[in-house]
A protein has these predicted regions:
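Non-catalytic pre-domain segments flanking phosphatase-related domains
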Residues: 1-7, 26, 30
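Short, structured coil segments at secondary-structure junctions
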Residues: 58-60, 68, 169-171, 225-226, ...
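Conserved acidic, metal-coordinating active-site core of Asp-based
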Residues: 101-213, 217-221, 234
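Asp-based phosphoryl-transfer active-site loop
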Residues: 3-18
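Mg2+-dependent phosphoryl-transfer enzymes with acidic/Ser/Thr/Gly-rich catalytic loops
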Residues: 1-4, 21-22, 184-269
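Active-site phosphate-binding/coordination module
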Residues: 20-121
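Short active-site oxyanion
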Residues: 35-40, 60-62, 148-149, 208-210, ...
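Active-site metal-binding loops of divalent metal-dependent hydrolases
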Residues: 9, 45, 214-216
Length: 269
């Protein structure tokens, strides 16, 4: 019996325009609620940005694994987080600034996602697509808080190459190029898979009672935490290989279509 359904957002739950059919979602979510199935977005987006995307009503009772699954938020309360120590975060920022000076570094703290004042307007808009709380700072290496995560956005799509230059930190932090334009860095041993396990403990749900959807390379650990693991038709081949099943693409509402079928089957049973 499925008790928990998790989904990545970009490229998975959201379509190519970054949106979803709210009416269809309400129908499917109603069926999930009737059957006491928990629903949890698991995403690189800031938790507050997820709440903004779903809106006040639709975000009620969501279990949000946000900020690259370094935090779990439920009904306005953080119930779990694992932070990257400030001193290590500053070393990583300094290294990233050495590697290149023409990409955007997003240094996320519990307060806000921080970017440099010199960030282009185009990249500022891109950042605001994933983060509601954003602050502009003169220098990222002057931040004094611990970090939720550090992210690189590279419009030139060189992240698969640049991530290799961070391997000196691989024992100290979890580092992944989720796709050619993105690198995500979080506390050591903290990724979507480990945070899903924290949520499963909180809810008393097993891997065998869990369903998950993903498309990116950073979703592989998420899929490994669920017996019913689905890669999207538009997923990376490595992600498809890690999944037990393949479903329709994000532009075909694959997540909602599959959830509709699953909840219908449960009603019949």
């Amino acid at each position: 019996m499925i008790k928990l359904i998790l989904t990545d957002l970009d490229g998975t739950f959201l379509d190519s325009k970054g949106s979803f059919d709210k009416e269809f979602y309400q129908q499917v979510k109603g069926s999930m609620d009737d059957q006491a199935i928990y629903f949890a977005p698991c995403t690189g987006k800031q938790c507050e940005r997820v709440e903004e995307l779903f809106g006040p009503e639709l975000s009620k009772d969501l279990w949000i694994l946000g900020d690259s699954a370094t935090r779990i938020k439920h009904n306005n309360e953080y119930v779990y987080e694992s932070l990257l120590p400030n001193d290590l975060g500053i070393k990583l920022i300094n290294k990233l600034e050495e590697i290149a000076n023409d990409y955007t570094i997003i240094a996320c703290t519990p307060t806000a996602a921080m970017i440099k004042e010199t960030t282009s307007e185009e990249d500022k808009q891109m950042v605001r697509g994933s983060y509601r709380e954003v602050q502009l700072v003169e220098e990222l290496n002057k931040i004094t808080e611990d970090f939720v995560k550090i992210t690189v956005y590279d419009r030139k799509k060189r992240c698969f190459e640049y991530v290799k230059e961070l391997m000196e930190f691989k024992e100290q932090a979890y580092i992944v190029a989720s796709e050619a334009a993105w690198i995500d860095i979080s506390n050591a041993g903290v990724h979507k898979g480990t945070t899903v396990k924290e949520l499963q403990k909180l809810l008393g749900v097993t891997k065998e009672e869990t369903m998950a959807f993903g498309d990116g390379l950073n979703d592989i650990e998420l899929l490994n935490a669920a017996t019913y693991s689905f890669a999207m038709e538009n997923a990376f081949e490595e992600t498809k290989a890690a999944a037990n099943f393949i479903t329709r693409s994000n532009d075909e509402q694959g997540v909602l279509q599959k959830n509709k079928k699953i909840t219908k089957k449960k009603k019949k049973n």
